[in-house]
Amino acid sequence: MIYEKLKKNFSLLFCLGIIFLSSFFASIIQTSFGSVDVELKELKTDDGQTLVYDLYKPKLANSSDKVPFVVVVPGFQRSKEALSNIAIELSRRGFAIALIDPYAQGMSSSSTSRLAATTQGYGMFALVDYVHEGNFAFVDINKIGSTGHSMGGNAAIRGADYFGKEAIRSSTKSKLDSVFVSGYVLTLRDNILKDSKSNMGISYALYDEGAFRNELKGWDAANMEIAPESLRAVNNALPKENQIDRVELGKYYGSKEEKNLRVVFNEKLLHPFQPYNKEATANQINYFEKVFGFP
């Protein structure tokens, strides 16, 4: 009787087994074989909005052994799961990570602003403020960063500007020590870059299909060696006598201590493949090792 029932429902049981095994192995990978705790959290912001995020906390991090903190911001119409690979790679190297659902995406609330990236960083600004106030005892508040792809990259640029202006007004260090901008260069403009007090890494796909919006046109639209956007980002950090007319890809310009370190990458990829490519991911990991060091 039991054998007949098992035989009759074999396909169902097989599928359920695959689901459970896949979930188990996915959990093992997400937690870096149990070395990282992953928790779904929610932040109620002062303006009545709700930001939902996954917190990746290395188990070795505590109030005595504080670690850097990086906010990961997905792009337009993407929920937090779209960049879970970046959160996993950074957390397994000892960083605490907040992988957010941007405002109006995933489980986060809608935004009260029509300019959610510019004025709120899709929720990243509020989270940086919250963490900088010392609400996570295991975080080194002098090593807070952000990374994002596409519109999430724009949020990172806007964060450097927003917290840079705040630092200038209060004559303090920027709360946002370092940012990494992936797949977005449209807002690398002088009026936005001039107040940045954050180190900045930039990664842009050479074959990005959105490059037609950039300042250069034709085949050179995405060439970050000569693009006005990348040249501005680098020259903004250099004295006038040392400014350049061609960017050396992968070279670090400026000073980490002065919070004007700059580096530009130009991987031979299409826009949507950038966050999942081995070379582009390695460039981002190496950047955060450079600015923060691995705990």
What is each model feature region?
Residues 30-294:
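Soluble extramembrane regions of membrane proteins in the secretory/endomembrane system
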